[in-house]
From Swiss-Prot:
It is found in: Cytoplasm. Its main location: cytoplasm. This is Argininosuccinate synthase. L-aspartate binds at residues 122, 126-127. It catalyses: L-citrulline + L-aspartate + ATP = 2-(N(omega)-L-arginino)succinate + AMP + diphosphate + H(+). One of its GO terms (molecular function) is argininosuccinate synthase activity. SUPFAM superfamilies: Adenine nucleotide alpha hydrolases-like (SSF52402), Argininosuccinate synthetase, C-terminal domain (SSF69864). The gene is argG.
Length: 409
């Protein structure tokens, strides 16, 4: 079909990417390298190796990489420094994983001499954009193969027929007690799409949720947790310092137990359509609330407001696939600069789906001055008479406008 010699496929070992693997071999007559990323999705990844071997992939062309620490340290934490939320709700669990997968695919392509990369994203979704913008940003001349935009296997029936014809194992997981939904998981979240969720008027079934108990079934006793931050990043939980991915895993455990982090939303995809999805982001929900709390005591007011103004733009960059763009990197530099003083601890209370901040402090960088903020006698620390001139000057433009309106009648 083309002069592609070797292609690196983002390979999960599931039905779709297994069909893609065989299709690449048959259609492009090229050597295939498989790459499977461990992002903390909680699945056994060794079967992906065994499946690749059955397709004739050379052992040296099978890559299964543990990227959990890099994912949280270099992608999730930088995003949370900006308090990033897309369209007021979505914590970008899928979006933030794609730049890392693309990065590693390109690294493998360079190491193995591959001239092409391939992914399993459909032509309807955001992931095709996220993957491919990453590929081109990191390796401008790379050939990109997107099977869902090329082949004629455009229905589930055709995909299954192709798999059966070529001896590809068909795992009907939902018949074995698994999920019938299209799912994506990593350490930050798990998402659910498809089936009856395509009807936005239908409530999600309780049996769908994997990581969280329902708030109604959560413990009747609240749990207090202390979180410590350094330069905007979480470094310890209840005094225990852990690696970045271990911290997020611990927050997921705590949040899941208390029914925290469920989300059912209709989002605006970059390609133009609206899509309904359900998400569980227990650890991320806790982290966002706690990070905003420590910022509230350590950030200057105008800096905090500037961050809030810029955050929706930053969120759109990540959602739409522009992680590797110069504008995202420039904005990240600004965000990271603001985090130099975001040091301290936050105490939260977890209770039946709620994350409640109950205390926060910073020994080194707190801007909260109790001698000024007190409602008691401040011993002259704040001269209330100064407020008169402050108010009159701020009212000047409105007084001028009112006078002009009076003259006009």
């Amino acid at each position: 079909m083309s002069d592609v010699k070797k292609v690196v496929l983002a390979y999960s070992g599931g039905l779709d990417t297994s069909v893609i693997l065989k299709w690449l071999q048959d259609t492009y007559q090229c050597e295939v390298v498989t790459f499977t990323a461990d992002l903390g999705q909680g699945e056994e990844l060794e079967p992906a190796r065994q499946k690749a071997l059955k397709f004739g992939i050379k052992p040296e062309n099978i890559f299964i990489d543990d990227l959990r620490e890099e994912f949280v340290r270099d992608f999730v934490f930088p995003m949370f420094r900006a308090n990033t939320i897309y369209e007021g709700e979505y914590l970008l669990g899928t979006s933030i994983a794609r730049p890392l997968i693309a990065k590693r695919q390109i690294e493998i392509a360079r190491a193995t001499g591959a001239d092409a990369v391939s992914h399993g994203a459909t032509g309807k979704g955001n992931d095709q954009v996220r993957f491919e913008l990453g590929y081109y940003a990191l390796m401008p001349g790379v050939k990109v193969i997107a099977p869902w935009r090329e082949w004629d296997l455009l229905s589930r029936e055709k995909l299954l027929a192709y798999a059966e014809k070529h001896g590809i194992p068909i795992e009907m997981k939902h018949k074995q007690g698994g999920s019938p939904y299209s799912m994506d998981a990593n350490l930050l979240h798990i998402s659910f799409e498809g089936r009856h969720l395509e009807n936005p008027a239908a409530e999600a079934e309780e049996s769908m949720w994997r990581w969280t108990v329902s708030p109604e079934a959560a413990p009747d006793a609240a749990e207090y947790v202390d979180l410590e931050f350094e330069k905007g990043d979480l470094v310890a939980i209840n005094g225990q310092r852990l690696k970045a991915h271990e911290l997020l895993a611990k927050l997921n455990e705590l949040g899941g137990k208390h029914g925290i982090g469920r989300l059912d939303l209709v989002e605006n995809r970059y390609v133009g359509m609206k899509s309904r999805g359900c998400y569980e982001t227990p650890g991320g929900t806790i982290l966002l609330r706690a990070h905003r709390a420590i910022e509230s005591i350590t950030l200057d007011r105008e800096v905090a407001h500037l961050k809030d103004d810029l955050m929706p733009r930053y969120a759109s960059m990540i959602y739409n696939g522009y992680w590797w763009s110069p504008e995202r990197q420039a904005l990240q530099a600004l965000v990271d600069h603001t985090q130099q003083t975001v040091n301290g601890w936050v105490r939260i209370k977890l209770y039946k789906g709620n994350v409640i901040v109950v205390a926060r402090d910073s020994k080194t960088d707190s801007l909260f001055d109790p001698t000024i903020a007190t409602f008691e006698d401040d011993q002259g620390a704040y001269n209330q008479k100064d407020a008169h001139g402050f108010i009159r000057l701020n009212a000047l433009r409105m007084r001028i406008a009112a006078n002009a309106k009076t003259k006009r009648g």
